[in-house]
Swiss-Prot record:
GO molecular function annotation: ATP binding; ATP-dependent protein folding chaperone; unfolded protein binding
Record keywords, A-Z: ATP-binding, Chaperone, Nucleotide-binding, Phosphoprotein, Stress response
Keyword ATP-binding carried by entry: yes
Name of the protein described by the UniProt record: Chaperone protein DnaK
InterPro entries: ATPase_NBD, Chaperone_DnaK, Heat_shock_70_CS, HSP70_C_sf, HSP70_peptide-bd_sf, Hsp_70_fam
Stated role: Acts as a chaperone.
Keyword Protein transport: no
Family matches, as PROSITE patterns: HSP70_1, HSP70_2, HSP70_3
Length: 645
């Protein structure tokens, strides 16, 4: 029987795996590598290069070499994330007739599904070369937070590549399969899969249980950001190099497509090197030229500098983790294991942040580049019937419902519901003799339908004349195991029905998803902001009071310059305290803390001298005395943290 292969279709790299008996095998490609760059190049003579060969010629053919195409799949051209990428990518992103984001290569518009299909074709061929037989069936992975449009588009890419996609499976769930299958522990375990890849971020909370000898993998919750990944980290490095080079040479490399492609390659290399070393040299001779001749680029990049450049990106992964824990109805301490997936999790800063949040060391026995493909292969074996001891229970990431009277969103299926699932509810007409009803399908967490994303709509016509509230219209929602939605409406009186499958051209952007969730919990988030601002203001005011008091007592013995610096810092902080900018208050507080260090040293020296004169050890003030808030009239208050949406 032909094998069902497992494919991790990644933003940066892709990987293919199969099951041999009960053992998984990641298959090497024709270049001998276990992962293949998700890069496709279109040559002048019509040849299509995929993987390492496409990557090698990218510098000389930037306009026709496509990478990170997964960031565009199933998205609209007008989406904010797509618009952001237009300025960053050396290739052209174009608007398709249906409003989708496509790419333009050699004067021809191509859908992201077609480009992804070229990558999938390479993975298919890799498996066929190893097995010595044709491969027609596959399980393909997607980020857990991919919406309906993105899942449909991925499935279409598989079909274009000549594959019957037996299942679309979530990447963190696949990684959990790879991790949990060989564990002999019979006790139930709750694991967090933190998946930071090339273009997307997912967090899933999964419970692994042993039920009568069968391993059950149940996803309790999932969250994420489908526009956050290694590509964004690379871009921070590229922006930094461009700024430094402009400062030194007066030339803007951002406008040079060839230079940008070289910078992209160098940034990725530097990022990888800095996971294992404290600094690296970025050396690009002949990067550009002007009237004075060729220009060479040589910049030292330290790990500390890289971490400061990407700190905000790493921090952005924590809010989804908090939400996932909350939605799973557990606390962080209930997590037994933390699994890291995706190449970006090799960065020490990421590992530190994960450890700090979960309070435990992440597991190191899972290969972050291969676990997802391995899990997909295991699921393939389950679907083929060759494996009976695994049960996988995944979830839908957002609530689904219809608009009812008064514009209300009536939720049919709530977020984090285990799939596949079906739900039906009976509705009626709002007016007398109403001949038809329009079923509008929405996705999101807001109570008012218009605040959510309209996925699609259809009519049920031919309703016999009757008083309002009399006709019985049954609306049914059906989410299949791929997370794809089918909606139907049926008049129970006449038996007439109509159905719709949500099409890929009605996708939902990650930005919209996050906005919906955030809007639904807006009040909680606003409260948290107010508390944080109050805390920052209290700390700032205490600092001003403390330093002013110390300055009055010991300022006379300071240099005039030092004293002026402290007074200026006090003035700046007092000005910031009048406003509402928490970051500015914190920054000015830290500036005053630094400026007052000399004052602290002076106080310490004065105290030592006084103690010496008194002939005893004395109780000297520490060097931080000036920086510590005075304890006059300090009231300890317990503030309950409101979880941020």
């Amino acid at each position: 029987m032909a094998k069902i292969i497992g494919i991790d279709l990644g933003t940066t790299n892709s990987c293919v795996s199969i099951m041999e008996g009960n053992t998984t095998r990641v298959i090497e490609n024709s270049e001998g590598a276990r992962t293949t760059p998700s890069i496709v190049a279109y040559q002048e003579d019509g040849e299509v290069l995929v993987g390492a060969s496409a990557k090698r010629q990218a510098v000389t053919n930037p306009k026709n070499t496509l990478y990170a195409i997964k960031r565009l799949i199933g998205r609209k051209f007008e989406e904010k994330e797509v618009q952001k990428d237009i300025d960053l990518m050396p290739y052209t992103i174009a608007k398709a007739d249906n409003g989708d984001a496509w790419v333009e290569v050699r004067g021809k518009k191509i859908a992201p599904q077609q480009v992804s299909a070229d990558i999938l074709r390479k993975m298919k061929k890799t498996a066929e070369d190893y097995l010595g037989e044709p491969v027609t069936e596959a399980v393909i992975t997607v980020p857990a937070y991919f919406n309906d449009a993105q899942r449909q588009a991925t499935k279409d890419a598989g079909r274009i590549a000549g594959l019957d996609v037996k299942r679309i499976i979530n990447e963190p769930t696949a990684a959990a399969l790879a991790f949990g299958l060989d564990k002999q522990d019979k006790a139930d375990r709750k694991i967090a899969v933190y998946d930071l890849g090339g273009g997307t971020f997912d967090i899933s909370i999964i419970e692994i249980a042993d039920v009568d000898g069968e391993k059950q993998f149940e996803v309790l919750s999932t969250n994420g950001d489908t526009f956050l990944g290694g590509e964004d980290f690379d871009q921070r490095i590229i922006d930094y190099i461009i700024a430094e080079f402009k400062k030194e040479q007066g030339v803007d490399l951002g406008k040079d497509v060839l230079a940008l492609q070289r910078l992209k390659e160098a940034a990725e290399k530097a990022k990888i090197e800095l996971s294992n070393s404290a600094q690296t040299d970025i050396n690009l001779p002949y990067i550009t030229a002007d009237a004075s001749g060729p220009k060479h680029l040589n910049i030292k990049l330290t790990r500390a500098k890289l971490e400061s450049l990407v700190d905000e990106l790493v921090e952005r992964t924590i809010a989804p983790c908090r939400l996932a824990i909350k939605d799973a109805g557990i606390s962080v301490s209930d997590i037994n294991d933390v699994i890291l997936v995706g190449g970006m999790t090799r960065m020490p800063k990421v590992q530190e942040k994960v450890k700090a949040f979960f309070g435990k060391e992440p597991r190191k026995d899972v290969n972050p580049d291969e676990a997802v493909a391995v899990g997909a292969a295991i699921q393939g074996q389950v679907l083929s019937g060759d494996r009976k001891d695994v049960l996988l229970l995944d979830v839908t990431p957002l609530s689904l419902g219809i608009e009812t009277m008064g514009g209300v969103m009536t939720k049919m299926i709530t977020k984090n519901t285990t799939i596949p699932t079906k739900f039906a509810q009976t509705f009626s007409t709002a007016e007398d003799n109403q001949p038809a009803v329009t079923i509008k399908v929405f996705q999101g967490e807001r109570e008012i339908a218009s605040g959510n994303k309209l996925l699609g709509e259809f009519n049920l016509e031919g309703i016999p004349p009757a008083a309002r509230g009399t006709p019985q219209i049954e609306v049914s929602f059906d989410i299949d195991a791929n997370g794809i939605l089918h909606v139907g409406a049926k008049d129970k009186g006449t038996g007439k029905e109509n159905k719709i499958t949500i099409k890929a051209n009605s996708g939902l952007s990650e930005d919209e998803i996050q906005k919906m969730v955030k809007d639904a919990e807006l009040n909680a988030a606003e409260d948290k902001k107010k508390v944080e601002l109050a805390q920052a203001r209290n700390q700032g005011e205490a600092m001003v009071h403390s330093v002013k008091k110390s300055l009055g007592e010991h300022g006379a013995s300071l240099d005039a310059g030092e004293k002026e610096k402290i007074e200026a810092a006090i003035k700046d902080l007092e000005e910031a305290l009048k406003g509402e900018d928490k970051a500015s208050i914190e920054e000015k507080t830290n500036t005053l803390m630094t400026a007052s260090q000399k004052l602290g040293e002076k106080m310490y020296a004065d105290a030592q001298a006084a103690a010496g004169a008194a002939g005893g050890p004395g109780a000297a003030a520490g060097p931080e005395a000036a920086s510590a808030p005075a304890d006059d009239n300090v009231v300890d208050a317990e503030v309950k943290e409101v979880k941020k949406g």
